[in-house]
């Protein structure tokens, strides 16, 4: 068994180069030449698979993963990554189907072995390209190939600490490694040989944070813990490898935390390929720079965020569609910090590199990393170690996965500089406390998460893989919906659409194979998929056969839903028979709806026709007769005899059918074929106007079919005929003769013996409209017959609608001048007035220009009262309309109809006529009250006499409370007259209010006492409280003696009454503020029915004392607060008075001489300018603003008294030219 053991990691480290073969193959010592490639299915060695292709085979939900010992996740997957750890997924949008989790067991096992056997330490950083390189905390580097085979291992011999950062170049031939104590090493990825060891390419005594290759094969970037960024140019001259280091960004100007070069695989097809572009981010901003051909800053932005969060940068090429529908593939950078993600597009415009802001996404928690997983998604890991997958276009979170148990490696030690003595700034150390730049990396659509002894992959499944995942977990509903979404999204791409259709068919076959036990499960989604992709044959054959004995009813229900939605128009004949049988049993009405939307050719006509006749499905019967039998008259001859006033559905259905046929439209929808239109119209019209039916009973009246329709609904039948008359067939001479014939038939059918006057009226109105529209010739006899009907004075049971139709028909005949030959306008006017057709009257008056009586026609017509005021408003400015004369003549009627609108019209256009109109209404108090009330409501200025008249009318017609409310809300009356009016109507409360308004509180009190004496019970208590409030309001007006007398009078009445004891205490408390306490107690003691013991008045006296104490304390507190406020103000002003003034100039603003200390100086305030007091006196002008800068001067001018000591010596002032003040300067604002 010892021969089967793999060589140890120590042996690899001691060898000159790493292993180039598989460890397992080396241990077995197999002879590869003896193996047959075909027999063992060995792939060709010259074409190696990509890393993504190989790693995608090890997905957690595949059988291969299960063989490796990883359990397949179910609805809530928890795949094993170790002995005690799990990964939890939360499918918020994708239901756990979008992200695929994989644990690389081979690499994880090698990491554990290295840590235990050779003391390599925990993993510290990783890099992924064609190989997977992992650095450890003790300076070891392990390189794996795509099969997770360890190719070689490298151990640092110089004690440079942990491997802080790793980076592969573009062709994966070189590996850069940065160490925590400053060493940068370059290794050959195939052999593991060290090609370069660079000890002095960064800031001394600092560690490496990042090493990154740029788009140039010989140029790399390195960022150190001091915040500086260095460019490393690799050279090879005469076989000697060298490196030139250059500082691009110094940490003294800002500490760079993140570096991300732009690397595009466009092979020179993009305009940006000629530039070497790098994104840098500090703790306060991020910026885009070009390193080649010359160093230049393209753009920078401020970047804010929490102090313990690092900035994040990631590039990706994205297809961008502009607003003008143009498309371009440009690099897009995502910049993140805190919970914010910003997206910017980098492109070349007019030869200049431009950075364009695209969108902003805000997440829930603070971010640790952000990486592109394809051009549409960004994976972000937050501080709770939850991985969020965000759709860039919709800014929505698709799915999330809990990575807390993956054991994520943090690089906080490098940011804190622990390996170099901690010589980093506190802000840098705080920000790097959760750094994971080099332990979470991405490549393509896969994210690599490095644990201490494990490596995890989170990939984004493709559309097809997601469907397979959902199918495997029997989530058919989601799988079908996802498949349909992909099919619909590929509408503009035929190849993609064909692939999507093929995948849906495959999904259907998987459903058939897995639904043996419960075939009805998710049946609706499968049916929807097949109908959407047009695979109806599978629906009618395989699926129907699968469900034939178990779930046919559910299948038929789903098919019916799609027929109603008109997504399918034809079904298999076998299924159509089953469909008819099913719905005949459950809902014949539903069957009728389905028949109308199905192609008749898929139906069993014998079965369906029998069913529709048996169950009276008239619409379906008409549809089948016209479509299947091509007979457009059979429905009329069979169904019209069945029409009765109670058969509303059948009657309406036939009316719609006849209207459609005469208009050339199919029933219930569509168009009749062009070649059949004329024949169909002719056949239907001939059938309707046939003199006898097929049965031809002996007592049958002529024209039974048309008669049946007219009997069912005369008005709608005539509307159908009116629409038919508009068709082209009735516009020529033959069509006009057909019109005459139909009109004669209608007149013959609608005789007084066989029709009501309402029905005959509808017919005559119809004829009048046809004549007015020039659809019928002007036949004098016909016109006279029509006019005799229109001019009838009374028609029994005529509704308002019928009367309106009669008016409209008459009006149309007049406007088209059809009645000029048989009657004059004057005669028409008399007939219209007798028939009460006031619209016709108005038209004739307008025509005869007799405008002064038009308003009368509006007043008589109740239906036109609302439009009457619009008519007056429209013509109020026209003198010939005589609007005011008509208003004055009909004022009483107008006020009765709408007093508010009448008043508005008069006050707006005729304010000077108001008094005249009021005089005309003096004898009609009701109308006068309405008019005055509306004027007052419109806030019109009424005279005092008019207000008093309105008050008089209020007193007569409204309640006392309404009168009092009117008095309170208006003030245009005279108080003496108002009091007299109110007293004459015995409205005592209104009188009391007027006395109070007049400040005659004594009279108001006496009258209130009379009301109190006449009241009893609760009403008396309310009245007493009202009087108390009255006396409280009279304090400032009544003399003290009069006020005390009133209170004594009130209390003398209240105290003896036992029913008022409930308010006695409150009244005594209120009275104690206005009556001497000794007199009040004496009054209580002397009052009849009140005990003189101390116990009875104890509560009163204690209440008085408590009130007095509270008021005393309140007064003391108020006085203290006032004194304190005054003291604070005094202190503030005292402090201001002891502060010096800030003077900005040493020259007088008037005389421009120096401000010497021997003269008085005035300072203007906040501007700091000053003048001599003598200059101000000489100018004899009161300055309101500074003469120098025109700043407003405060009301209280500030003056500087002459000081006792010289503030400026003459010599120093002449030399320095400035004032020197001892007090600190201040500004006045």
From Swiss-Prot:
Gene ablation phenotype (knockout): Semilethal: animals can complete metamorphosis, but most of them die as pharate adults unable to emerge from the pupal case; surviving flies are weak, fail to unfold their wings properly and die within 24 hr. The eye color is similar to wild type flies. In larvae, results in the development of hemocyte-derived melanotic tumors in body cavities, accumulation of crystal cells and lamellocytes and disorganization of the sessile hemocyte compartment which might be connected to the abnormal increase of circulating hemocytes.
Compartments where found: Early endosome
Keywords: Endosome, Metal-binding, Protein transport, Transport, Zinc, Zinc-finger
InterPro entries recorded: Clathrin_H-chain/VPS_repeat, Quinoprotein_ADH-like_sf, Vps41/Vps8, Vps8_central_dom, WD40/YVTN_repeat-like_dom_sf, Znf_RING, Znf_RING/FYVE/PHD
CHCR repeats: 901-1063
Gene3D superfamilies membership: YVTN repeat-like/Quinoprotein amine dehydrogenase (2.130.10.10), Zinc/RING finger domain, C3HC4 (zinc finger) (3.30.40.10)
GO-annotated cellular components: CORVET complex; early endosome; HOPS complex; late endosome
MF (Gene Ontology): GTPase binding; zinc ion binding
Disordered, as annotated region: 67-89
Function statement: Part of the class C core vacuole/endosome tethering (CORVET) complex involved in endo-lysosomal vesicle trafficking and lysosome biogenesis by facilitating docking and fusion of endosomal vesicles. The CORVET complex acts upstream of the homotypic fusion and vacuole protein sorting (HOPS) tethering complex but is not involved in autophagic flux. The CORVET complex may cooperate with the early endosomal tether Rbsn-5 to mediate endosomal fusion. As part of the CORVET complex recruited to endosomes by activated GTP-bound Rab5.
PANTHER family registered for this protein in UniProt: VACUOLAR PROTEIN SORTING VPS41, VACUOLAR PROTEIN SORTING-ASSOCIATED PROTEIN 8 HOMOLOG
Subunit relationships: Component of the class C core vacuole/endosome tethering (CORVET) complex composed of at least Vps8, dor/Vps18, car/Vps33A and Vps16A; unlike in other species, Vps11 is not part of the Drosophila complex. Due to the reduced number of components the Drosophila CORVET complex is often referred to as the miniCORVET complex. Has a higher affinity than the homotypic fusion and vacuole protein sorting (HOPS) tethering complex-specific component lt/Vps41 for Vps16A, car/Vps33A and dor/Vps18, the core components shared by both tethering complexes.
Protein name per its UniProtKB record: Vacuolar protein sorting-associated protein 8 homolog
Species of provenance: Drosophila melanogaster (Fruit fly)
């Amino acid at each position: 068994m010892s021969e089967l053991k793999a060589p140890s990691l120590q042996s690899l480290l001691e060898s000159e180069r790493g292993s180039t073969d598989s460890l397992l193959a080396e241990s077995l010592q197999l002879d590869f030449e003896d193996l047959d490639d075909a027999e063992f299915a060995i792939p060709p060695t010259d074409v190696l698979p990509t890393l993504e292709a190989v790693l995608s085979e090890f997905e957690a939900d595949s059988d291969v993963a299960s063989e490796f010992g990883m359990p397949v996740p179910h609805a809530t997957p928890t795949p094993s990554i170790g002995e005690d750890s799990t990964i939890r997924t939360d499918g918020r949008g994708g239901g756990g189907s979008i992200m695929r989790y994989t644990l690389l067991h081979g690499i994880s096992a090698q990491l554990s072995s290295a840590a235990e056997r050779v003391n390599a330490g925990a993993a510290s950083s990783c890099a992924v390209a064609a190989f997977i390189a992992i650095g450890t905390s003790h300076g070891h580097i392990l390189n794996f190939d795509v099969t997770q085979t360890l190719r070689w291992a490298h151990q640092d011999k110089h004690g440079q600490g942990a491997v802080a950062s790793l980076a592969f170049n573009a062709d994966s031939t070189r590996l850069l490694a940065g160490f925590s104590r400053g060493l940068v090493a370059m290794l050959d990825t195939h052999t593991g040989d060290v090609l370069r060891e660079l000890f002095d390419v960064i800031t001394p005594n600092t560690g490496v944070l990042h090493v990154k290759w740029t788009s140039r094969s010989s140029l790399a970037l390195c960022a150190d813990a001091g915040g500086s960024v260095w460019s490393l140019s690799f050279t090879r001259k005469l076989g000697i490898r060298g490196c030139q280091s250059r500082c691009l960004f110094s940490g003294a100007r800002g500490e760079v935390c993140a570096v991300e070069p732009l690397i595009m695989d466009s092979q020179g097809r993009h305009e940006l390929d000629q530039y070497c572009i790098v994104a840098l981010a500090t703790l306060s901003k991020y910026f885009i720079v070009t390193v080649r051909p010359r160093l230049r800053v393209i753009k920078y932005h401020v970047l804010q965020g929490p102090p313990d969060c690092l900035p994040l940068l990631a590039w990706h090429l994205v297809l961008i569609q502009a607003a003008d529908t143009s498309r371009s593939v440009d690099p897009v950078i995502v910049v993140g910090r805190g919970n914010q993600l910003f997206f910017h597009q980098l492109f070349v415009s007019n030869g200049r590199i431009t950075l364009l802001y695209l969108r902003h996404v805000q997440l829930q928690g603070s971010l640790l990393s952000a990486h592109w997983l394809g051009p549409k998604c960004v994976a972000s890991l937050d501080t709770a170690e939850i991985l969020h997958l965000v759709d860039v276009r919709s800014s929505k979170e698709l799915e999330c996965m809990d990575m807390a148990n993956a054991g994520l490696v943090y690089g906080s030690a490098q940011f804190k500089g622990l390996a170099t003595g901690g010589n980093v700034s506190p802000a840098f150390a705080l920000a790097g406390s959760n750094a994971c730049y080099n332990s979470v990396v991405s490549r393509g659509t896969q994210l690599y998460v490095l644990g201490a002894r494990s490596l995890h992959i989170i990939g984004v499944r493709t559309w097809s893989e997601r469907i397979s995942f959902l199918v495997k977990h029997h989530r058919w509903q989601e799988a079908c919906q996802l498949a349909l979404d992909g099919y619909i999204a590929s509408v503009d791409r035929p190849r993609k659409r064909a692939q999507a259709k093929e995948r849906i068919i495959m999904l259907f076959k998987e459903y058939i194979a897995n639904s043996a036990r419960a075939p009805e499960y998710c049946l609706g989604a499968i049916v929807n998929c097949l109908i959407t992709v047009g695979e109806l044959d599978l629906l009618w054959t395989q699926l129907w056969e699968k469900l034939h004995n178990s779930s046919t009813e559910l299948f038929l229900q789903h098919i019916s839903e799609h027929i109603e939605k008109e997504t399918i128009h034809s079904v298999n004949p076998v299924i159509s028979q089953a469909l008819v049988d099913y719905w005949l049993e459950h809902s014949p009405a539903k069957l009728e709806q389905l028949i109308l939307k199905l192609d008749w050719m898929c139906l069993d006509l014998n079965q369906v026709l029998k069913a529709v006749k048996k169950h009276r499905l008239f619409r379906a019967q008409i549809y089948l007769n016209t479509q299947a039998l091509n007979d457009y008259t059979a429905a009329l001859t069979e169904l019209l005899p069945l029409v009765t006033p109670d058969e509303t559905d059948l009657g309406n259905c036939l009316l719609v059918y006849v209207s459609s046929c005469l208009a050339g439209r199919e029933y219930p929808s569509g168009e009749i074929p062009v070649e059949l239109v004329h024949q169909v119209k002719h056949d239907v019209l001939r059938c309707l106007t046939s003199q006898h039916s097929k049965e031809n009973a002996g007592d049958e009246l002529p024209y039974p079919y048309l008669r049946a329709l007219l009997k069912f609904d005369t008005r709608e039948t005539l509307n159908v005929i009116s629409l038919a008359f508009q068709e082209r067939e009735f516009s020529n001479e033959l069509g006009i003769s057909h019109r005459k014939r139909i009109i004669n038939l209608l007149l013959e059918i609608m005789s007084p013996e066989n029709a009501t006057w309402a029905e005959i009226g509808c017919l005559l109105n119809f004829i009048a409209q046809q004549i007015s529209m020039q659809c019928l010739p002007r036949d004098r006899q016909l016109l006279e017959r029509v006019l005799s009907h229109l001019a009838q004075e009374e028609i029994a049971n005529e509704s308002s609608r019928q009367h309106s139709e009669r008016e409209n028909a008459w009006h149309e005949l007049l406007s088209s001048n059809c009645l000029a030959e048989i009657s004059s306008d004057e005669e028409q006017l008399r007939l219209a007035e007798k028939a009460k057709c006031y619209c016709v009257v108005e038209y004739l008056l307008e025509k005869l220009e007799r405008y002064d009586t038009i308003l009368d026609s509006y007043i008589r017509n109740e239906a036109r009262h609302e439009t009457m005021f619009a008519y007056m408003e429209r013509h109020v400015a026209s003198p010939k309309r005589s609007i005011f004369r008509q208003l004055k003549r009909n004022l009483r009627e107008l006020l009765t109809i709408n007093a508010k609108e009448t008043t508005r019209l008069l006050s707006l256009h005729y304010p000077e006529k108001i008094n005249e109109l009021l005089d005309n209404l003096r004898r009609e108090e009701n109308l006068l009250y309405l008019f005055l009330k509306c004027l007052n409501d419109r806030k019109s200025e009424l005279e005092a006499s008019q207000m008093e008249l309105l008050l008089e009318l209020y007193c007569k017609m409204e309640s006392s409370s309404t009168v009092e409310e009117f008095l309170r809300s208006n003030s245009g009356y005279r108080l003496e007259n108002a009091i007299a009016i109110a007293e004459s109507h015995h409205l005592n409360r209104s009188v009391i209010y007027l006395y109070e308004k007049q400040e005659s509180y004594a009279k108001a009190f006496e009258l209130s006492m009379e009301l109190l004496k006449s009241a009893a019970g609760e009403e008396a208590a309310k009245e007493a409280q009202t009087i108390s409030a009255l006396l409280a309001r009279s304090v400032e007006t009544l003399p003290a003696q009069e006020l005390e007398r009133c209170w004594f009078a009130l209390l003398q009445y209240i105290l003896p009454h036992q029913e008022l004891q409930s308010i006695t205490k409150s009244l005594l408390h209120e009275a104690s503020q206005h009556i001497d306490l000794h007199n009040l107690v004496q009054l209580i003691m002397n009052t009849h029915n009140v005990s003189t013991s101390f116990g009875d008045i104890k509560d009163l006296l204690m209440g008085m004392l408590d009130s007095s104490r509270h008021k005393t304390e309140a007064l003391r507190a108020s006085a203290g607060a006032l004194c304190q406020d005054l003291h604070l103000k005094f202190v503030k002003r005292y402090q201001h008075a002891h502060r010096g003034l800030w003077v900005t100039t040493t020259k007088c603003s008037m005389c421009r001489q120096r401000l010497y200390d021997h003269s008085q100086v005035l300072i203007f305030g906040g501007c700091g300018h000053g003048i001599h007091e003598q200059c101000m006196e000489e100018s004899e002008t009161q300055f309101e603003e500074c003469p120098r800068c025109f700043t407003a001067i405060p009301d209280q001018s500030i003056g500087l008294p002459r000081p006792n000591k010289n503030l400026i010596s003459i010599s120093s002032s002449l030399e320095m030219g400035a004032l020197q003040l001892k007090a600190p300067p201040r500004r006045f604002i």
